[in-house]
Every structure is written in structure tokens, then in C-alpha cells.
């Protein structure tokens, strides 16, 4: 019996020792993944100002309004497509590369659920998925939300003032930027007030910058949680 007790004690001691050693090894692995992935997420963050400048330039803002009006009237998703083309190479691709370092499967329901745990606002991202990719979905969904928050009153007034015919003319293209601006501004004070223009040129850049940087951080956080689950 004493011999059995000694053997059991030694066994438990070995198990305990292994368990204690596993914690720093796991943390070291995470640190290594972080070091390899961080440059990609940093690249995405550095590209945010240029993307925001592109999306909030007056011509782009008018075109986005036209696309949002058409989507509202026709049930299309052209705003998402437009934003995807603007966000993909400078922001989405680096984030996808960073996620790949962690070995994340961003098409899985598990990763979508983790994103929702990181930020409850991501719970509805499946409806915005392009090709089923969650990383694309969170950027598109959040950017659309920011645009709707800032430009929603413009879109509502354009929808009521012009109707589907002008919405299609604005969105179909190809139209020169000057023509797009002329169509949108044609509604005068009814469709685009001075306050609306101020929001588009002043409020939207700051809001969009903060949002995109937040999504980049949340994306990396979700990747780390995926590894640790």
C-alpha cells in the first residue's frame, strides 16, 4: 500500500508538472503567432486614412448616396460591392493574411460566433457575407452602418425626391463625377442641406476611421480566441 501511494503521488506530480509547463508553452505559441500576424494587421491600419479619404471625397460620397438609394428602391446590394472594391486590397486582404497566420477558418460558423462574442454588432454579419467570408462581411456591414448613420437623411430625401429613375441613373454609370454631383445636388436644400454636407465631409471621415481601426483590432482578437478555444 505505501508503495502504491508513492507511485500515485509521483504520477500526480508528473501530471501537475506537465500542466504547469503547458501554460507558458501555449502562451509562447500565441506570442509567436502574434509576432507573425501583427505586420499584416498593422499594414491594414496604415491603409485606413487613404481608404477613408477615397470614400469621403465629394464625388465618392455622392456616388455612395446614389447606390444606397438604388439599393433601397430595387433591393440590390451595389453599395456592398462598391465598398468591397474600395476595402479589399488595402484593408481586407492584409487582415485575411493575418488571420491565415492563426490558421482561422473564416467561413466557419465557429469563427462567426467568435466575432459576435468580440462585438455584439457582428451578430448579423452573415447577411453581408461576400462569398461566405466573415472578414469581408464585418468590414462591409460596419461600413454600411456608418454610411447609413451619417448619410441616411440624404438617402431618404433623394429616394423621396427623385424616385427609381434617377437612382438608377446615378448608380448605373459610367457617369463622370461632375454629372453624379449634379444629379445629387439637383434636389437643392430638400435633398442635401448644409448640415448633411458638413456631416459627409467632416463627421464621416472621423467616424469611418475609428470604425475601421476597431474592426481590424476585433478581427485579430477573434483570431486569437479561435486559437485558444
Predicted region positions:
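Terminal export/targeting leaders at protein ends
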Residues: 1-125
